[in-house]
Amino acid sequence: MLHYAYVKNINSNSTYRYAIVFASRAVADEWWHAVSTSAIVKFSDSIRRVNAQFYTHDVGQANAADSLTVNGVATQFLGKVFFTLLDDLGGRQLSIIPPLHFADHISENSFYIRSKVSPYEYWYCPLLSNSNATNLVYVSRTERTRFRVCLAEKGTAGTVMIGSDEIVITVPSLSRSIDVTDSGQVILATAPQSGLKFSDLLSKFTVGPTVYKDGQSLDTRELLYTDDGEKWELA
């Protein structure tokens, strides 16, 4: 699905205003990662991300549109992103981009994790009567648990996460992290799963068998890790 954003010139209220079209939400976040970490300092200093659909640039330093054509910035996105220069303030026209409703993938924020195909199915860690969590993670249509997702690298709170980033998923109230057993069961552990990437969270987990107790369905299913997983999203 296409992703849209605006760019505004911080030095003027009337010029160098753009609408950007990205091939996908992931491309938008990856473009921002490339720009914000570029060794071409005039670009990393010029362009700022206000939120997922609004950026600013200091045209006196660097024009955001040029990020696609200046070597060392974000030329790898030339075929996946385009900028359209909007009318100046006096043009009396504005191209309204469609609002997109989603959770921004910011490191150390907390999220519900739900199925992209069946958005009423959520990751869930049930609590026992003694307030201790079971060690298994489930998928439920009636219950849900908030998880904190953060980059594995320390000191990166507030950073936009992209697919290649290594992450840690925790349940803050329990001081436990998501881990995966050798058989693929998703569990809560004191140490997180090593090498887990953000793209794995979104595509390498699947729903297992229904859980029964005393012959009765508990309306939950096991969560499993697999290379051929389902699509998940943060909410």
Model-identified regions with their sequence ranges:
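Lectin-like carbohydrate-binding module/patch detector with strong preference for beta-trefoil
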Residues: 1-235
